[in-house]
Amino acid sequence: MNMSSSSRKLSRLFNIVTQNQKSPVLLSSDQEAARRITACLVEKSTIGKLQSNPSLLFNLNSNVTRLVLSEPTLPTQSCIDFFKLLREFESNLKPDLTAVVTLSHRLYSNRRFNEMRSLLNSVVNDGFYKRPVEELGSAMVDCDISEEKFEFFEKFFDLVFRVYVDNGMFEEGLRVFDYMVKKGLSIDERSCIVFLVAAKKRRRIDLCLEIFRRMVDSGVKITVYSLTIVVEGLCRRGEVEKSKKLIKEFSVKGIKPEAYTYNTIINAYVKQRDFSGVEGVLKVMKKDGVVYNKVTYTLLMELSVKNGKMSDAEKLFDEMRERGIESDVHVYTSLISWNCRKGNMKRAFLLFDELTEKGLSPSSYTYGALIDGVCKVGEMGAAEILMNEMQSKGVNITQVVFNTLIDGYCRKGMVDEASMIYDVMEQKGFQADVFTCNTIASCFNRLKRYDEAKQWLFRMMEGGVKLSTVSYTNLIDVYCKEGNVEEAKRLFVEMSSKGVQPNAITYNVMIYAYCKQGKIKEARKLRANMEANGMDPDSYTYTSLIHGECIADNVDEAMRLFSEMGLKGLDQNSVTYTVMISGLSKAGKSDEAFGLYDEMKRKGYTIDNKVYTALIGSMHSPET
């Protein structure tokens, strides 16, 4: 039987005795009670001995518990077991603050610091740490531990401080810090760094600054590491100039920043695409003799790529190697990814080969970048080879990689292959996300396989995936193409009621459907609604409306819209011209139609048979 189940059994037994024993056996003194309990605990079966004599526990109180835990003849492990046993009870037998301090002191004396920290962590939910920190100091006195034992005091409060931080109790941690300063206890900078790191992870930059200020004011040793954490926190918050001032302030005090300190500021500037800001930092680094490290080079390469200077990124990569700084998988993956985005697949594969020749193992991100690159250029065979290689080498295929493959197949119109990849993804335990379903449904839609497109979107809803704007637009488009504009309209209204807002594409789909059916009034209303919601009609919107007005024989209104497009700087493409020429020709306005035909030729548009047929027809149509 394990310790926990034995403790629970004893707890139940004690409760039974409590209810049924009218006159428990009370011993003459706390010392006698402690001696009797200690005698039980030195036996091999600690819990078993107490189970045979549970009435002993009636004599327990705070002082007896303290005497037992501080008894030098009792093995420390027995003390730990006894403490754990008492924590199982739901009565006043539970260990109090003096018990925690006593056992902590014992563990400290035995140099069992990890167990001491575990003990303090284990009682975090027992309510002790919600009390004022001064009560911890009072408990020391109650346990006959004098403040002269500075070493224990410092270790104890240092661990309590860390426990607060581990459990996200930052305000309480600050109070412990202040108490230690007040009592003249030295504070370990490493513990303060633990606080800084934890607060930064939770994006509590205010707390980082607060503890750092206390560290400076109380004379805690400040190192470049703690300074860098605060600098990074400020940069995350967008306060780059403040972080630079902090670096300057501590440089004067002899805390010289390292490359990784400056990297945090460079990273902030890179995200802002602030090239001059980066140049300023590099000048300071050069002046102070701070040498670039791997991260510095990687950030500078990233900035070069963002500024469209891939050749500069390659030069930095070469410079890094010339200086003997070894590139890791992250550096290679970044370069491979950037080259893939630029369509430089040959260079990307050369870098991949170089990576493997150096004995580095490509990560899922490395393969993902290459797969994304080959998918974008339509080389799905290469994508399959890379995926198979990932599997053979035991590299995890992430959902991002699966989605990339699905997107690649759908771009090529290979929707059945995309569906098979989806099945493999499901077998691997991945849940379909909105991107996956939208990609496949859109492909079915483009291929005019409308029933399958709808099935995918319905399947998405049944699987609990919330429809996005793209999902609704897809479904609305399918119904419009099937001629079911009423159902499309119902979905259009439904999406807004469910908090999914239509975008310009959604409006364009509905406007086109109404125009095609000759419902020009409804199309006009949608345009007005679109503009009221802050969306400007684009070339597609205008072309649809022009087509609708022409169908409704409102060719003058269509021409007005055509002119309005030009005034707004919208692209009057070949489709727009063809629609307008057809409308004018049908209305017998051959001069205007031929005028637009001449414009088309001047702009270099390809003129198809529809235009010629319309122009010929215009010469035989009476002008309206």
From Swiss-Prot:
Keyword line: Repeat
Keyword DNA damage listed: no
Residue ranges of PPR repeats: 153-187, 188-222, 223-257, 258-292, 293-327, 328-362, 363-397, 398-432, 433-467, 468-502, 503-537, 538-572, 573-607
Disulfide bridge positions per record: none
Pfam families named in the record: PPR_1, PPR_2, PPR_long
Keyword match Repeat: yes
Family of the protein in this entry: Belongs to the PPR family. P subfamily.
Protein name per its UniProtKB record: Pentatricopeptide repeat-containing protein At2g32630
Source species: Arabidopsis thaliana
Classification lineage: Eukaryota, Viridiplantae, Streptophyta, Embryophyta, Tracheophyta
